């Protein structure tokens, strides 16, 4: 209304906009509303949260992060201020799978059968392999993910995609979690997982092997989802001069951000570590 006053009579503007002249003058004397006065501070808080969460959170998860830092604000307001500030999440891209199931090794039955829920930690693990480009060539990354906590419990990286790399990731997961016998281990039908050495290792640890159907990425969807998240939030936005640089940054992403800080909707907006901690606290209290 202030912008149109030089060109139009005040009385006419008030009639068109449905306000009284006295009401207009009263609003001017009151000054900016408390809500309007909050905007600059909220913009700073939202921008800080966007950076703190590595530009990966949408409005709902951003709201949870802000609440955790003592800032209460509605989702719709966050959406509006994000648009105003030009803040956007990192975007996903498509990437190719690494599985080569063209071999004559024995294959396990699909025991998991897309039942992506687990009642307790160390009940079901998922595993898969992906690759990361560096100036030195490909870096292959193996991961093991707990289906209950969504935590990456084991991982290993190297310049070759071998059964030994997969075995190293499994050993790390076992050393960290000490799972009970009977754990369900699900993977694709890649030759690394079907190798005699790896199958023997699973048997020695008392784990039951389960494998996806041929060419069906949905059979291992939570693990595929982690790779997509890693690539969207880190890999696609970085240039790695060496494999060692990539190893350092991927390790930091998994250990510091993904496992301990990154909120997940399916975990009641907790991080994997916080969800796991809550599980054991509730179990002790029961």
Predicted regions and their residues:
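Charged DNA-binding/catalytic regions of mobile-element recombinases
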Residues: 1-286
